Design a protein with these regions (language model features):
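Two-component/phosphorelay signaling modules centered on CheY-like receiver
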Residues: 17-34
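Receiver (REC) domain active-site loop signature in two-component systems and cognate sites
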Residues: 60
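Active-site beta3 strand of CheY-like receiver
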Residues: 49-55
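Short hydrophobic/Thr-rich beta-strand motif most characteristic of the beta2 strand and flanking loop
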Residues: 31-37, 45, 107
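C-terminal output helix
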Residues: 111-121
């Protein structure tokens, strides 16, 4: 009897196609990856596909990452999904804003593959 191993699902949210492509390349070996290009799409996908973790860019058109994170964390159907803010803005104030909106972690661009994988594994290992 074959054992089926189910990969955890990661939602990558970034308005830059190159960042999504790089993140997908880094993550696709260990995770199922879905993508969104703005906060509104992220909320829809979080509700319909229930990812195990969300990597959310902070600054995007249509709806920024902080607003989307807050909406995801307010919704009973998605509030337990960890959100990791991934952004070029590493100021302490922005980190605190992300935490206030419900973000679980933070990764600053540019990041190494190990930075991203380590943060996801850390967040997924936290009960």
């Amino acid at each position: 009897m074959e054992q089926v191993i189910t990969k955890k699902k990661v939602l990558i949210v970034d308005d830059e196609p190159n960042v999504r492509r790089l993140s997908r390349t880094i993550l696709s070996k260990n995770f199922d990856v879905v993508e969104a290009e703005d906060g509104k799409q992220a909320i829809e996908i979080a509700n319909t596909q229930q990812p195990d973790v969300i990597l959310m860019d902070m600054m995007m058109p249509k709806m920024d990452g902080l607003t989307a994170c807050h909406a995801i964390k307010k919704d009973p159907a998605t509030k337990s999904i960890p959100v990791i803010m991934v952004t070029a803005i590493g100021f302490e104030l922005n980190i605190k804003l992300g935490q206030q909106m419900g973000a679980t972690g933070y990764v600053t661009k540019p990041f190494t593959p190990n930075d991203l994988l380590d943060k996801i594994e850390q967040v997924l290992a936290t009960p």
